[in-house]
Amino acid sequence: MSEWKESLNVPKKDTRHKTEDVTATKGTGFEDFFLKRELLMGIFEAGFENPSPIQEEAIPIALAGRDILARAKNGTGKTAAFVIPALQQVNPKVNKIQALIMVPTRELALQTSQVCKTLGKHLGIKVMVTTGGTNLRDDIMRLEDTVHVLVGTPGRVLDLAGKGVADLSESPMFIMDEADKLLSPDFTPIIEQVLHFFPEDRQILLFSATFPLTVKAFMDRNLHKPYEINLMDELTLRGITQYYAFVDEKQKLHCLNTLFSKLDINQSIIFCNSTVRVELLARKITELGYSCYYSHAKMIQSHRNRVFHEFRNGTCRNLVCSDLLTRGIDIQAVNVVINFDFPKNAETYLHRIGRSGRFGHLGIAINLINWNDRYNLYKIEQELGTEIKPIPAQIDKNLYVAESSENIPRPFPIADMPRGKESKRNEQFQPQQNQNQQQQQDGQNQHSLGPVPPQGPPQGIPGPGYGYPPPQGFPQGMPPQGMPPQGAGGYMPPTPYGYQQQGFPPQPPQGFNNGQPQQPSQ
């Protein structure tokens, strides 16, 4: 081993079994790509061992300057497949934006920028993230300093480029992650406008798990002899086992509570089809005694950032969300995904279940379906060429629990993670009602989560486990009724990239990766 390798601060090796989605390679190593030593140091210190198939295919082609259209499964290392060549080609001595990475969501932008910083920490490269929902003036001031790699969402990038603040005229590389979403009718006009700010000889890299016809139309117009990579021999990840439970709508909460009590959940993500149902379900889960956060697109951006960081860092076990977090979000500790509301199309389903079983690991996806979902279930099975099985009475833990669970990347040992009250009785969330009360309730609401709340933050949130973090200086005035006072539960104003307030968040136990948050997956 080289001397420089011996001095690296390499994290503990992840010994969990990995599927062929990430192990079926040609045996190429990262050093075979002739990368800068400083970049290799960042790669190995992030815990990367060998390239995954998509990295093995894409990195050398990207380094050769070719346009790329790459299709690979969720959770197989696409982010590093474009971040590594971007960092390799950046010259830190040139004070210009040299790579733009465009992503469709704010959370994915934060995550991707963190991967860039982690892998490029020895390169002296400046990475900036810019998204909607943040202060435009702050972004303009930050761009007055040197920025080598810009990560952002379409609207904000176009705004900055149009004002002449983000100079892309000498940027040789334009990367689009989740390109199918970025080239949907909502975003395509913005992407086309952003392209006009690049030089004519720019390099374009498109990465996604699915590519509809809109992507081909864009490719034909803007890419020059693109190199096409398709590693989708099948659409779903091999490590994810899929089940469905046929449940009446009013019994879904009861079924969810049963799953919580029976499954060995490391971390879980529960999906709903509307923002209203996200908040209602999060409230119900917390009332059952389980730690739970929620996140959806209508939340204030600072709240979304805080929920995302805390869930990623292991502060909470369960997250209820809309399709906001279906794309690209990489949290390796998630081993269970539950579709409380069944998705309407195969693309959404594919991205949802891809939040578990990240980077070749194991996970399960459980779908709670009612009578009206049966046609969608059949249609999704046919389109994806996969089988969604009826849920058995007992689920084999070997399907979703790692043999060496202590090696799962997380800042908190599993024993210390908040688990909630596992022995709640059914009567606590299904109170007995007489016939008149039942009829009245049925007339008011036909779903399992109770009446729809008024607009705005819900009232009487039951403590800090609920996931609605009220920072100091709540923008609508006083925090909602029932919020803990300042200092209770550790609430502090968030910062965009973590927490700078003394004593928050709680520090992980000693001996776990020097107390640092989990490293990004490949």
UniProtKB/Swiss-Prot annotation:
Low complexity bias locations: 428-446, 497-522
InterPro entries found in the cross-reference section: DEAD/DEAH_box_helicase_dom, Helicase_ATP-bd, Helicase_C-like, P-loop_NTPase, RNA-helicase_DEAD-box_CS, RNA_helicase_DEAD_Q_motif
Chain location of the short sequence motif DEAD box per the record: 177-180
Residue sites binding ATP per the record: 72-79
Domain Helicase ATP-binding: 59-229
Compositionally biased region (Basic and acidic residues): 418-427
Pfam families: DEAD (PF00270), Helicase_C (PF00271)
Protein name: ATP-dependent RNA helicase DHH1
Organism: Yarrowia lipolytica (strain CLIB 122 / E 150)
Lineage: Eukaryota, Fungi, Dikarya, Ascomycota, Saccharomycotina
